[in-house]
Amino acid sequence: MRLLAAIGVLAIIGVFGAALYFFGGFYSVAGTQEDPAIVHWALVQVRTASIVRHARDPQPADFDDPANVQKGAHEFDEHGCANCHGAPGGNWQKFSEGIHPDPPDLKDVVPERTPAQLFWVIKNGINMTGMPSFGPIGATDEDIWQIVAFLKKLPNVSEADYKAWTKPPAPPAPPAPPAAAPTPPPADAPATPPAQNQ
């Protein structure tokens, strides 16, 4: 009985101590500091479990068609994904070094995720990270599946292919100028005499 009472007292002290630590402002939320190992571990476990549970969207049958892969590279570039995650032949932008946790190198992450999980993350974002949700800002499901198709091929995409797929389209040719209207004769020019019958 005394043992149970002691355990109960210690549990209460632990709860109050944790509450004081977190709600008393002692836990630093600065992006320049790493989370304690136990906090980092807990966040990773919660994040992974949440993604696995919520990623239920069925992938389109032809989502990894080569044309979709190329369109996905264009969408990846247009939405600024390379700024934080890099791209074949491209570097991360300087500001991404200030994001915590660090944006992952997608070549390492993609093999660990199913297409449905990648789709869910891109569409919904991840709370308490720098990963935004692209669904609410105009990316359609088709756009996102194309990005997923590109990501699944990313480990084998060359710099030359990426540059070719993301190259801006050539501007359309300017319209041809309208044909010039015939110049009317001057007002004081003599009229052409009518032809006379012979």
Language model features: what each stretch is:
Residues 67, 103, 160-168:
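Polar/charged alpha-helical tracts
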Residues 70-82, 112-117, 126, 138-141, ...:
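Sequence context surrounding c-type heme c attachment/ligation sites in exported
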Residues 2-74, 135-150, 167-189, 193:
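Periplasmic c-type cytochrome electron-transfer domains
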Residues 74-100, 124-128, 132-133, 155-160:
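Periplasmic/extracellular electron-transfer cofactor-ligation site
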Residues 88-91, 110, 135, 193:
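Short, well-ordered turn and helix-capping elements at secondary-structure junctions
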Residues 68, 89, 121:
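Short glycine- and Lys/Arg-enriched binding-loop motifs that mark or flank ligand-binding interfaces
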Residues 43-44, 93-95, 119:
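Short, flexible segments with low predicted structural confidence
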Residues 98-154, 198:
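Extracytoplasmic electron-transfer domains, predominantly the class I c-type cytochrome c fold
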